[in-house]
Amino acid sequence: MESFGRAIVIPERLMDAASATAGSSPAFVFMFIEALADGAVAAGMPRAQAYEFDAAAVAGSAQLVLETGRHPGDLKDMVCSPGGTTIEGVRVLEEGAFRASVMNAISACVEKAKAL
């Protein structure tokens, strides 16, 4: 059952949510990597190098969540130095409703799945 990846058994009532978050999130992650790279390119980094840096950062961050079992918010807080560049970027993302936009996208996917 796991020849193509990890199998997780869930109740049928969670199928739409699982489909939305597991099935659609790769596209959102690709968009995030692309946006990170676009920002780096705007700052002068070559695109290929930006993709390499940003894809590695996303992969490493995801691996930390899986390996440590720590809450993603705790991990975020660990890399935000007081008054530093990362917390400034987090502030800007929050001003732009980053989390709300992601949550709304998942909700839209769930509603679409229910309609199919």
Residue ranges of model-derived segments:
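Aromatic-residue-lined binding/catalytic grooves and analogous aromatic/hydrophobic interfacial grooves
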Residues: S25
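Internal alpha-helical scaffold of NAD(P)-dependent oxidoreductase catalytic cores
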Residues: M1-A18, F30-E67, K112, L116
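NAD(P)-dependent Rossmann-like dehydrogenase/reductase catalytic/cofactor-binding core
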Residues: A55-L116
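Alpha-helical membrane segments and immediately flanking helix-loop junctions
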Residues: T21
